[in-house]
Amino acid sequence: MVLTCDDEQMITSISFQTQPSVVGIGIGIGTHAKTVSAFRAFLEQNKSPLVIDADGINMLSKNKDLLKLLPIQTVLTPHPKELERLIGVWKNDFDKLEKVKALSKEHNVIVVIKGANSITVFDGKLYINTTGNPGLATAGSGDVLTGIIT
């Protein structure tokens, strides 16, 4: 299902007439202040599991208080730059993974770090998918991953 908004310039409301079994959100919705307000209102009333990518992650990065509104086991799917915005700069790969584990634990979320070797972090554990290839660095492949997880 795809939701539309009456405002052609930005998303100003996010609502459903039915209770979805899961919601994938963030791809292409922008980060305008009105969209952030709509995202906040959605998170405050949402009862469905979430998969958050792209601009959804960017809104969480700029508004860290929104992390407290996420349902347990929400899936976040950042690429490296989105991850940096979310957890800050890291010194090395070990530091990066420690920061992601801390985020996952504090907010009870699942983090899928997209890359040549995608890494899933949850409950203090790391799961590494070594089957990736350079073809996954194609624009839109992360959007497809979000759809598959959703």
Predicted ranges, named:
Residues 128-140:
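Short pre-catalytic strand/loop immediately N-terminal to key active-site residues, enriched for Gly-Thr
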Residues 1-131:
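Glycine-rich phosphate/dinucleotide-binding loop and adjoining beta-alpha-beta core of small-molecule
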Residues 85, 138-150:
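Short, small-residue alpha-helix embedded
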